[in-house]
């Protein structure tokens, strides 16, 4: 919650070119660090850092459906978190999760092939390896954002600490 409050407004302003309509930052009244289970409803939220440091997934136990949010996207995910090794681990966790159906916020029903392609893309970005343009299939803007943002988030905390209130 404190991270959301601290960085939320800054991120909204920084990413305005990607907004569709107006956005208001509303902080949650319940947070969790590992899992949040609603046993009566057969619903479980699981901390799954990757797309952001505070990403989570939601498992509907009754229907065996895993909602992965923005963690998996076709053809490539937005990389807005500096720990890409953790992101890859989260995607491996999702790939091996025993759900009958996995649903992405932007890509609908997904399969392990897409998850593997997302992992491979993240690994290439992490290691600075060349990426064939066919991998991001017409999503050059997302790819360029990922490469540029990778540098930004790598040094964000250091710059924020040095500049304090002048950072924004």
Residue map of PLM features:
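Accessory terminal helices/loops
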Residues: 3-16, 95-101, 109-168
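Phenylalanine-focused residue identity feature
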Residues: 10, 32, 38, 45, ...
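Metallo-beta-lactamase
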Residues: 1-49, 53-118
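Short flexible/disordered coil segments
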Residues: 19-28, 32, 53, 103-107, ...
């Amino acid at each position: 919650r404190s991270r959301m409050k601290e960085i939320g407004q800054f991120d909204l302003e920084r990413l305005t070119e990607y907004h569709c309509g107006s956005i208001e930052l509303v902080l949650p009244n319940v947070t969790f660090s590992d899992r949040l289970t609603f046993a009566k409803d057969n619903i479980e939220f699981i901390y799954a850092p990757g797309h952001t440091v505070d990403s989570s997934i939601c498992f509907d136990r009754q229907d065996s459906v895993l909602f992965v949010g923005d963690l998996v996207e076709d053809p490539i995910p937005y990389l807005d978190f500096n720990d890409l090794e953790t992101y890859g681990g989260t995607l491996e966790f999702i790939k091996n999760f025993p759900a009958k159906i996995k649903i992405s916020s932007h890509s609908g029903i997904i399969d392990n092939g897409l998850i593997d392609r997302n992992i491979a893309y993240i690994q290439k970005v992490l290691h600075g390896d060349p990426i064939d343009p066919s991998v991001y299939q017409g999503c050059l803007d997302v790819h360029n954002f990922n490469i540029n943002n990778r540098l930004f988030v790598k040094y964000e905390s250091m710059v924020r600490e040095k500049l304090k209130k002048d950072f924004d």
